[in-house]
Amino acid sequence: MTSAGGFPAGAGGYQTPGGHSASPAHEAPPGGAEGLAAEVHTLERAIFEVKRIIVGQDQLVERMLVGLLSKGHVLLEGVPGVAKTLAVETFARVVGGTFSRIQFTPDLVPTDIIGTRIYRQGREEFDTELGPVVANFLLADEINRAPAKVQSALLEVMQERHVSIGGRTFPMPSPFLVMATQNPIEHEGVYPLPEAQRDRFLFKINVGYPSPEEEREIIYRMGVTPPQAKQILSTGDLLRLQEIAANNFVHHALVDYVVRVVFATRKPEQLGMNDVKSWVAFGASPRASLGIIAAARSLALVRGRDYVIPQDVIEVIPDVLRHRLVLTYDALADEISPEIVINRVLQTVALPQVNAVPQQGHSVPPVMQAAAAASGR
């Protein structure tokens, strides 16, 4: 017996990676098919506006939006000069809200990012001055250059979504999203994120080089007067879209598939993957399962659906698991990457063939319904 949302009966709600409760029940967006089509059109406008500035990197732009809709944080890794920082700044400008940037350096201390109490001699009292972490969108540039105590302070804010200064608690504004960047090729003067802290990020996205055609377009587009991004969304729009994404339908068979994939990273020998057992020291936590479901729901909304299909789950699994797997020294010596492990698991765990559409929902994607209705007028 399953619930209306395709989850096993009695499963109840769960918490998204952002720590907010979400119900598994499926609720259609206000306005039905036309309402969903309008929301998807708004998301498409936002993506188009970002792509006016960022040439190529289509998956990066889409995953950043999915992370925002999922209330999860994003870790970007790539060599210098591939538009990691520009992508985050442009994205924050397009989706609205307050934006703050912290350039991490070895001499930072936690109060530099969180804030502190300042004594006002004229009034003979203390004032609380909040740090740059209090913003809707925070860019943590080169997060692996800051010492561990600064990283821990930031990642605690990411998880708890509030800061405590002088015995007072200050909540983070909503929505709250941290996008951190790091450079994988520098090993001197850096402080790699520990496994427990990497687990706080919903996605880890590897940002690669552009193609020759894309690089040529970058030169033409940025050569004279670089284009300026315009705001498309507001914070109210974001909160509404997050709620819509959280209510997207997920078939119980897909939930079971996600659980089996994540479990296979912990006990691969039970599925006959003895090679994976020698590669992985520690598998993914239940937070990864929650992240995959939340991200698949958001990706479905970006793609114009109010239900999740197997392809949505397959696409987000590598980005959710990539930074959560702890490989053995033997695997690192043999140049076994997390991608190799993830592909091996996906090839072994059978993907269910299910009817992903809710029985009491739409039989075809709502955007298609709206388009058909418009053409029939």
Swiss-Prot record:
Compositional bias annotation for Gly residues: 7-16
Protein source organism: Mycobacterium tuberculosis (strain ATCC 25618 / H37Rv)
The superkingdom of the source organism is: Bacteria
- Disulfide bonds, paired cysteine numbers: none
Q: Does the keyword Zinc-finger apply?
A: no
Gene3D superfamilies associated with the record? Magnesium chelatase subunit I, C-Terminal domain (1.10.8.80), P-loop containing nucleotide triphosphate hydrolases (3.40.50.300)
> Per the entry's comment, what about the domains?
Contains an ATPase chaperone domain along with a nucleoside triphosphate hydrolase domain.
Biased-composition ranges for Low complexity? 19-33
Membrane spanning segments where? none
Record-given protein name: Chaperone MoxR1
Per its UniProt record, what PANTHER family does this chain match? MAGNESIUM-CHELATASE SUBUNIT CHLD, MOXR FAMILY PROTEIN
Q: Does the keyword ATP-binding apply?
A: yes
Amino-acid positions noted as binding ATP in the UniProt annotation, renumbered to this chain: G78, V79, P80, G81, V82, A83, K84, T85
Give the family from UniProt. Belongs to the MoxR family.
A cellular component term from Gene Ontology for this protein is: peptidoglycan-based cell wall
Q: Please describe what this protein does.
A: Displays ATP-enhanced chaperone activity. Required for the proper folding of the peptidoglycan endopeptidase RipA and its secretion through the TAT secretion system. In vitro, prevents thermal aggregation of MalZ protein and protects the functional activity of the restriction enzyme NdeI from thermal inactivation.
Record CDD domains? AAA
Region Disordered, as annotated, extends over: 1-33
Provide this UniProt record's keywords sorted from A to Z. ATP-binding, Chaperone, Nucleotide-binding, Virulence
Assembly notes: Interacts with RipA. Interacts with host Toll-like receptor 4 (TLR4).
